[in-house]
C-alpha cells in the first residue's frame, strides 16, 4: 500500500526543510557533510523531527557514536553486514525522544497554511545531550539524499526516505524502531474498549485469544495505523467464519482446505485466524484485503489476498493496536540477516540502489559538473510558501496535496521520466559514450559488491539438521516442478511430532547444562557443620529448607519457560529450514479464485 503524501503540517515540513538546507546544498561532498555535522555538534543544536512530536536529531560525529576504532567505509562498518549494497553512508547524529525540549509551536492556523513565519526557529539548543555511544537509533545519509536509520540494539537497518524532502514530510512516524517496548507508545486503536481490554488480557496463549475472538466474532474493530486511514478489522476467531468474506465465499471446500493448510505450513505451527482487514462495500459483502493470523507464540502475521503471501505484522496484541498495518506500508524497508528474517517471516529488504545507475546517467554529460548542480534551486522550490495552500474555492488548482505533485515532489523515479536518456540516445552521442561507460563503471565500483542475502550463509548445526530432515521428506520432483509449486505445494513438517525425540534429546542436553548451575543448589552449598541440638543449628536447617523450597520453585519455573522456549525455537528452526530448501525455487502460493469465478453462471 502507498503511504500518504505527508504526516505533518505544511509549516512543520517547511521548518524541517530549512533545518536541512545546508545538508541539501553540500550533499555531493562527504567532507563538507562531516564538517557541517561537526559544527552543529559543537554548538549543541538539534533538529526537531516533523513527526511524531517529541523526536529530535542530535548532531553527533561518527567517532563519538561508534568509537575512534570504527571503520567508516566498506563491509566492516557498523551497517556493512546489513545494507544490501556496499554504499558509503554518512552519520548525521542520533535520534532522541524528549517531552521537555520541543520547538516553538505556532497557534492554530487557517486553511492558508503557507503564512508561516520565516523566523529561524527550526533548531533547538540542548544543554545536556545523552551519551551518543549509548544511543539506540542513528540517522545516516546516503547518496542522492537517501535517509537510513540504524537500530543498534536490534541490529536492524531501516530505509527511511528516498530524499530529504520525503524525510521532512513523513519524519519517523513509520519507523518501526520507535515503537519498541521501552518507548511505551500509547495505543492508537482503543475502541471498542471492552473488546480491546479482553484482547489485551488474554494474549498469553493462542487458546485464550481464540476464545475471546470467537466471543466477539462478527464485530468490527477500527484498526488505526499512524498517519494513515482507519481500516475495519472484522473478527473471525474460526476458519469457518472466513467463508462469509469475499473472495473466500467463492472457494470450493477442497480449495478452502488447501488454503488453511497453507496457513499452517507457512507458520510451521498451529494457526488461529483472528480476522480480516478490508472494506465493507454497498454490495453487503465484506471484501477482504488481508487475513490476520496468529501463531503459537501469539505473534501476528498477515496473508495478502492479492499477492498470496504471508508476512509478519506485529509481535504482540499491544504492538498491533499501536502500529496497525505499518509493516504493510513499509514492506521491504527493513534490512537484516536472512536467517532472522526467515524465522520471523519478515519481508526481505528491497534494494533502493537500482535507481542510482539511472540517476548517474544524468551526470555523465560533460557540461554537468558539481558546481552547476541546482541544489539551491531545488531547495527554494521545496520551501515555497504556496506549496501547501488549500483553496477550496479554486477547483482548477492543483498543488502538492494531490498524488500527481510535480517534478520536485514525487517524480523521483528516473525510469518514469520522459527526459531519461535512453540507450538509443546514448548510442547517438558517440562523443560522450566513453565518458558514460567509465562513469558507470566507476559508480558501480563505488557501490561495492552486493551483500549475499542467503539463509545458507548463516547456517547453524541445528538448522543444518533441520534442513536435512526436511529434504528427506520432500520428493525431489516436487521441488523441481514449477507447475506443482505454483499449484500451492507447501514444504512443511506435516507431523507436529516429527523427529521430536531427536530435538528433545538436544534440548535436554541444553537443559541439563542450564540446570547444573551452582545457584540452583543454594541450600546444599551454604550448609556448614553445627551441633544438632543448638538453636543456631535449628535456625540454619530451617533457613536451608526455605532456600531449597525457593530454589525448587525457581527450577520448575525455569523448566516450564525452557519448555516453551524450546517449542518456539523448534518453530523458528522449521521456518528457516523451509526458507533454505525453497531458496532459488518458486515460492509456494495457494490457489485463489479467479475473477471469472465471481460471476454468476448465467453471465
From Swiss-Prot:
- Chain segments carrying region Disordered: 496-536, 549-568
Q: Which InterPro entries match?
A: US22-like
Compositionally biased spans, kind Polar residues: 517-533
Q: Enumerate the Pfam families for this protein.
A: US22 (PF02393)
Start-end of Acidic residues biased regions: 496-513
What the record says about family reads: Belongs to the herpesviridae US22 family.
**Name of the protein:** Uncharacterized protein HHLF5
Supply the source organism for this entry.
Human cytomegalovirus (strain AD169) (HHV-5)
Taxonomy of the source species:
Viruses, Duplodnaviria, Heunggongvirae, Peploviricota, Herviviricetes
Amino acid at each position: 500500500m502507498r503511504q500518504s503524501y505527508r504526516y505533518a503540517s505544511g509549516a512543520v515540513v517547511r521548518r524541517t526543510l530549512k533545518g536541512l538546507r545546508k545538508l541539501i546544498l553540500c550533499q555531493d561532498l562527504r567532507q563538507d557533510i562531516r564538517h557541517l555535522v561537526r559544527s552543529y555538534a559543537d554548538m549543541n543544536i538539534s533538529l526537531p523531527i516533523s513527526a511524531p512530536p517529541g523526536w529530535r536529531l542530535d548532531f553527533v560525529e561518527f567517532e563519538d557514536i561508534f568509537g575512534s576504532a570504527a571503520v567508516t567505509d566498506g563491509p566492516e562498518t557498523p551497517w556493512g553486514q546489513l545494507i544490501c549494497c556496499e554504499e558509503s553512508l554518512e552519520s548525521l547524529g542520533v535520534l532522541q525522544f524528549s517531552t521537555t525540549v520541543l520547538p516553538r509551536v505556532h497557534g492554530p492556523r487557517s486553511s492558508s497554511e503557507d503564512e508561516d513565519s520565516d523566523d529561524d526557529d527550526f533548531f533547538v539548543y540542548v544543554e545536556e545531550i545523552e551519551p551518543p555511544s549509548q544511543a539506540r537509533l542513528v540517522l545516516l545519509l546516503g547518496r542522492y539524499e537517501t535517509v537510513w536509520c540504524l537500530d543498534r540494539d536490534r541490529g536492524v537497518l531501516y530505509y527511511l526516505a528516498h530524499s530529504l524532502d520525503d524525510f521532512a514530510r513523513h519524519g519517523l512516524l513509520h519507523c518501526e524502531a520507535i515503537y519498541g517496548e521501552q518507548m511505551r507508545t500509547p495505543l492508537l486503536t482503543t475502541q471498542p474498549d471492552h473488546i480491546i481490554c479482553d484482547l489485551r488480557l488474554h494474549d498469553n496463549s493462542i487458546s485464550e485469544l481464540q476464545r475471546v475472538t470467537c466471543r466477539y466474532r462478527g464485530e468490527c474493530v477500527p484498526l488505526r495505523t499512524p498517519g494513515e486511514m482507519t481500516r475495519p478489522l472484522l473478527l473471525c476467531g474460526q476458519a469457518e467464519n472466513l467463508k462469509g468474506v469475499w473472495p473466500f465465499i467463492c472457494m470450493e471446500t477442497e480449495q478452502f482446505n488447501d488454503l488453511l493448510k497453507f496457513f499452517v505450513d507457512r507458520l510451521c505451527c498451529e494457526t488461529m485466524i483472528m480476522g480480516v482487514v478490508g472494506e465493507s462495500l454497498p454490495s453487503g459483502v465484506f471484501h477482504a484485503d488481508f487475513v490476520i493470523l496468529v501463531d503459537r507464540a501469539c505473534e501476528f502475521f498477515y496473508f495478502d489476498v492479492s499477492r498470496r503471501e504471508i508476512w509478519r505484522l506485529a509481535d504482540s496484541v499491544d504492538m498491533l493496536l499501536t502500529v496497525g498495518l505499518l509493516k504493510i506500508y513499509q514492506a521491504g524497508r527493513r534490512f537484516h540477516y536472512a536467517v532472522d528474517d526467515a524465522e520471523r517471516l519478515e519481508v526481505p529488504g528491497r534494494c533502493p540502489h537500482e535507481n542510482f545507475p539511472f540517476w548517474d546517467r544524468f551526470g555523465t554529460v560533460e557540461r554537468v559538473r558539481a558546481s552547476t548542480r541546482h541544489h539551491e534551486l531545488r531547495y527554494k522550490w521545496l520551501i515555497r510558501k504556496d506549496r501547501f495552500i488549500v483553496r477550496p474555492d479554486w477547483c482548477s488548482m492543483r498543488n502538492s496535496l494531490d498524488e500527481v505533485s510535480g517534478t520536485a515532489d514525487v517524480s523521483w523515479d528516473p525510469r518514469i521520466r520522459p527526459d531519461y536518456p535512453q540507450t538509443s540516445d546514448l548510442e547517438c552521442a558517440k562523443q560522450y559514450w566513453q565518458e558514460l561507460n567509465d562513469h558507470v563503471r566507476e559508480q558501480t565500483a563505488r557501490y561495492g559488491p552486493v551483500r549475499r542475502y542467503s539463509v545458507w550463509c548463516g547456517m547453524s548445526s541445528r538448522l543444518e539438521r533441520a534442513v536435512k530432515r526436511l529434504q528427506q521428506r520432500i520428493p525431489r520432483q516436487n521441488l523441481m516442478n514449477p507447475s506443482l509449486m505454483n499449484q500451492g505445494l507447501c514444504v512443511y513438517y506435516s507431523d507436529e511430532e516429527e523427529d521430536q525425540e531427536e530435538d528433545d534429546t538436544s534440548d535436554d542436553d541444553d537443559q541439563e547444562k542450564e540446570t547444573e548451575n551452582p545457584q540452583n543448589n543454594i541450600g546444599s552449598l551454604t550448609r556448614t557443620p553445627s551441633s544438632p541440638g543448638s538453636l543456631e543449628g535449628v535456625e540454619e536447617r530451617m533457613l536451608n529448607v526455605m532456600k531449597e523450597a525457593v530454589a525448587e520453585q525457581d527450577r520448575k519455573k525455569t523448566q516450564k519457560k525452557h519448555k516453551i522456549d524450546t517449542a518456539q525455537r523448534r518453530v523458528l528452526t522449521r521456518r528457516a529450514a523451509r526458507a533454505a530448501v525453497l531458496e532459488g525455487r518458486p515460492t509456494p502460493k495457494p490457489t485463489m479464485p479467479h475473477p471469472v469465478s465471481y460471476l454468476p453462471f448465467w453471465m
